[in-house]
A protein has these predicted regions:
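Basic/polar N-terminal segments that are highly enriched at the extreme N-terminus
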Residues: 1-12
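N-terminal catalytic cores of NTP/NDP-binding nucleotidyl/phosphoryl-transfer enzymes
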Residues: 10-22, 26-88, 204-235
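A glycine-rich helix N-cap at a beta->alpha junction
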Residues: 83-109, 114-115, 122-125
Length: 556
């Protein structure tokens, strides 16, 4: 797998899928574009699905076409309406609307009829072998498969057995329906693939009507054909399935949908295997599927990522035919770009030390106007209370600073953001030598917009101790310590690379206006980073998740 850094991410040109679509439209191969997004409702969508959603819906929109949402609900054991609902919520959150909501189960009757047609054409048969016998009989890439002893049953016998399978006469695994193709075919998928298996389980939509269910390779292409899908876009691992996709369509003589493949998304410091993510949830390594450290769409939404930033990310990553490893910092860059333009600003102090202004009038409160977003100078402002005692960040003061240190120091001056210039006069320490208070004086003539403007090199944020609101801060980092999680040695437990510091819970002291913010997106804690109000918040306890840092060395 090729690692892609910021320079390697493609600039925006026509990708190969756009070239195919434009050629198809120009030649008349199709009159309009119809795509689909076909998730299986057996789990929560992740960032890789988000890319696929953006591609399928985005291509259709660009070329004036439509996109269906089709749930591939062919395995009743693993599927649930809970996942159906979450998938629909995720797609809407990303900003897309589907043309039709469809289910593979809508087509069970038609798929069954086509299966009988294949039997009548001598292209399918009922096999009594066990799963293990079928697997062994397929052979290997170097060794041809072995024909089943049941392969040459008559059409009449196969029809009778298949109908008995449908009627519930047989137990799970007792019989299967297989396509009759070529047991020596170089493509292993052509060695008499399974079409139907017996599963006596309640289906989330069809109930107990069916006890036989179609396999993915059989249901997928035919469902596309029923919906007149012109461009069936899959990830690269399905390229070997395409000849079989075409074989079924050809033999049944139905609308010729076409499958195309693109490289799936691989991110640094991330796993997207459904099995591994489920293990993280079940073993309480994370709080749930929507844990902000998870690569699920509901997880990144809870962390504070915006749909605009995810669409931007999908656009920047682009569409490729080759597997790539994309730097997680690109996704962080995208959300930072979006939030920098739109997010409201507030001051929050995480590691406070008290700063006392000795020449401030006791009990006096002065309210300052501060812009909610400097990018919109004509936009709304907020009121910030200023008093003679404030909190500043402990690391914004140094007794013995290095050269070019522009924050507060003994006898040094800084501006308290939006207010006055102050000068450090005295440092108070406890018995252990820890700084507990910094005493300063302020220059009353240095108020912004009043008198002669005087500049200083340092400006720091602060919060009035009298008005400070305590909030819980959840500081999230990468879930894993290894960048290339897909390249860890075979047999090694991926959980060995879990980052023990992926979540640090602390507290901060916020200006009161923060608690009144109803923008619905992450806000910027000035000079700190972007934070999103967590659903765990209550009127008595406000919780903020760190979305991303304010700055990063990554540039696009």
């Amino acid at each position: 797998m090729e690692e892609v850094n910021k320079e390697a991410v493609e600039t925006r040109n026509l990708n190969f899928l756009e070239e195919i679509i434009e050629a198809d439209l120009a030649s008349g191969k199709c009159e309009s574009v119809m795509t689909r997004f076909p998730p299986e409702p057996n789990g929560y969508l992740h960032i890789g699905h988000a890319k696929s959603i953006c591609i399928n819906f985005g291509l259709a929109k660009k070329y004036g076409g439509k996109t269906n949402l089709r749930f591939d609900d062919t395995n009743p054991v693993k599927e649930d309406t809970e996942y159906v609902d979450s998938i629909k919520e995720d797609i809407k959150w990303l900003g897309f609307e589907w043309e039709n909501e469809r289910y593979a189960s809508d087509y069970f009757d038609q798929l069954y009829e086509w299966a009988e047609e294949l039997i009548r054409k001598g292209l399918a048969y009922v096999d009594d072998q066990t799963q293990e016998e079928i697997r062994a009989g397929r052979g290997t890439v170097q060794v041809p498969g072995t024909e089943s002893p049941y392969r040459n049953r008559s059409v009449e016998e196969n029809l009778q057995l298949f109908r008995e399978m449908k009627a519930g006469k047989y137990a799970d695994g007792e019989k299967v329906l297989r396509a009759k193709i070529d047991m020596a075919h170089p493509n292993m998928l052509f060695r008499d693939p399974l079409l139907y298996r017996i599963i006596h389980a309640h289906h989330h939509r069809t109930g107990d009507k069916w006890c036989i269910y179609p396999m993915y390779d059989y249901a997928h292409g035919q469902s596309d054909s029923i919906e007149n899908i012109t461009h069936s876009i899959c990830t690269l691992e399905f390229d070997v399935h395409r000849p079989l996709y075409d074989w079924f369509i050809e033999k049944l003589g139905i609308f010729p949908s076409h499958q195309y493949e693109f490289a799936r998304l691989n991110l640094t410091y991330t796993v997207m295997s459904k099995r591994k993510l489920l293990e993280l949830v079940k073993n309480n390594f994370v709080s749930g599927w929507d844990d902000p450290r998870m690569p699920t769409i509901c997880g990144i939404r809870r962390r504070g990522y915006t749909p605009e930033s995810m669409r931007m990310f999908a656009e920047k990553v682009g569409v490729a035919k080759r597997e790539q490893l994309i730097d997680l910092q690109l996704m962080e860059w995208c959300v930072r770009q979006d939030l920098n333009e739109r997010s409201n600003r507030y001051m929050v102090v995480q590691d406070p030390v008290k700063l006392t202004i000795t020449n401030w009038e006791p009990g006096k409160v002065e309210w300052f106007d501060a812009p909610l977003n400097p990018a919109d100078p004509e936009g709304p402002s907020r009121k910030v209370p200023f008093t003679g005692e404030v909190y500043i960040e402990r690391n914004d003061f140094m007794e013995e600073p290095p050269k070019k240190y522009f924050r507060l120091k003994p006898d040094g001056e800084v501006r308290l953001k939006y207010t006055y210039i102050i000068k450090c006069q005295e440092v108070v320490k406890d018995a252990e030598g820890n700084i507990v208070e910094i005493k300063c004086t302020y220059d009353p003539t240095s108020k912004p917009g009043a008198g002669e403007w005087r500049s200083v090199k340092g400006t720091i944020h602060w919060v009035s101790t009298e008005h400070a609101k305590e909030v819980e801060l959840r500081l999230y980092d990468k879930l894993f310590t290894e960048a290339q999680m897909g390249q860890i040695p075979e047999g090694e437990d991926y959980k060995n690379y879990l980052n023990p510091e992926s979540l640090v819970i602390g507290k901060g002291y916020a200006e009161p206006a923060l608690l009144e913010d109803n923008s619905g997106i992450a806000v910027q804690f000035e000079r700190v980073g972007y934070f999103f109000k967590d659903p765990d918040s209550t009127p008595e306890k406000f919780v903020y998740n760190k979305t991303t840092a304010l700055k990063d060395s990554f540039k696009f």
